[in-house]
Amino acid sequence: MQSYFNELEQVRYEGSQSTNPLAFHHYNPDEMILGKRMADHLRFAACYWHTFCWGGADMFGANAFDRPWQQPGDALALAKRKAKVAFEFFHKLNVPYYCFHDVDVSPEGASLQEYLNNFAVMTDVLAEKQAASGVKLLWGTANCFTHPRYGAGAATNPDPEVFSWAATQVFTAMNATRQLGGENYVLWGGREGYETLLNTDLRQEREQIGRFMQMVVEHKHKTGFQGTLLIEPKPQEPTKHQYDYDVATVYGFLKQFGLEKEIKVNIEANHATLAGHSFHHEIASAIALGIFGSVDANRGDPQLGWDTDQFPNSVEENTLVMFEILKAGGFTTGGLNFDAKVRRQSTDKYDLFYGHIGAMDTMALALKFAAKMIEDGQLDQIVAKRYAGWNSELGQQILQGKMSLEELSRYASQHNLNPQHQSGHQELLENKVNRYLFG
């Protein structure tokens, strides 16, 4: 059978002077950055859902793409054909990882037993494809939001039978992820939220999803899964208000149910936009709270109130993101998954490559500039100087709980404190960042 992307052998690094649109201009996998290969810093992954499952439909139009595996026919045979094309794409794009939802790779079927049988078959197919290609699984997850049964949520559903079906999907997807050597397992609460408080018991739903997550953690330890569990925050869409609104909200939830040491976050840039935050803010918040895990690299449109899932193309924005990640020691089990899709009018199959190549070059440049910022050290020095007072005897006594409010009041009076404001030098810092980026 002829390959689907028959006009391309493999995308390779050709340098910034190349005019080849099917080549990397900045992403050189073997280039050493801060003592580590660029590929090992970035840990790129392509996603199954936007790339091979979306047919181009939107709220106002039908499918626009010609994808042979999306035509009518035997569902399992078409899933196998899709897997063949997917791994051809992963290989030719030269990405080390991929990600999937259960029903991205396997037909859901007409019953729970059909779902289980189909997924078992496709897990074996994926294992064969991974072994033949060398492509690995960054993370797996379960789609507990598309089917009509999940109209009122999965773990937060008012019906415990729906909760049980969702638990079966997550149980099965976790086992498949472990079997395939997945390095993480993601939990995104697509419909874990509400449309109106008039028919919603917030306390009840919070208890339900808390218990669900506890069961996921219990299953991880029971089976010996060595990967990281990740929650992906999102404020709204498809529901009006979702319980995993942003990083800070997720952390509060994890603390309530004693899970802050068990589950980290997978941060999507577009979801940060929807929450009214910068991507930089969400990354820095997760790192500060000790729950940073992985990234869905994309971008949203700040003028639109929905998830546009465009490919990342802002080197400036992503340099600051990579700066935070590098300062924190880089990825461990996580990586940069492109949760992004081509535009509906981009109907040429090679548009899939153009989108990913541009995104990979963007993140490669961001990594290089972030490394310059790390090596130069000026930004860190300015921040350290700004907070230096907290390393003094007074600062340490406060932080270590050795002074009460009354004692601090007495100290201030006895020492006749009269502190003066010190400049934050924001403009200077912004100029420095621009010089790293533009010279």
Swiss-Prot record:
Biological processes, Gene Ontology terms: D-xylose metabolic process
Binding note for cofactor: Binds 2 magnesium ions per subunit.
Residues involved in Mg(2+) 2 binding: 268, 271, 307, 309
InterPro entries: Xyl_isomerase-like_sf, Xylose_isom_bac, Xylose_isomerase
Cofactors: Mg(2+)
Coiled-coil blocks: none
UniProt-annotated binding residues for Mg(2+) 1: 232, 268, 296, 339
Signal peptide: none
EC number: 5.3.1.5
GO cellular component, one term: cytoplasm
UniProt subcellular location: Cytoplasm
Annotated catalysed reactions: alpha-D-xylose = alpha-D-xylulofuranose
Main location: cytoplasm
Top-level taxon of the source organism: Bacteria
Catalytic machinery residues: 101, 104
One MF term in the entry's GO annotations: xylose isomerase activity
UniProt xrefs under HAMAP family: Xylose_isom_A
Similarity remark: Belongs to the xylose isomerase family.
NCBIfam families, A to Z: PRK05474.1, xylose_isom_A
Quaternary assembly: Homotetramer.
Protein name stated in the entry: Xylose isomerase
Taxonomic source organism: Yersinia pestis bv. Antiqua (strain Angola)
Taxonomic classification: Bacteria, Pseudomonadati, Pseudomonadota, Gammaproteobacteria, Enterobacterales
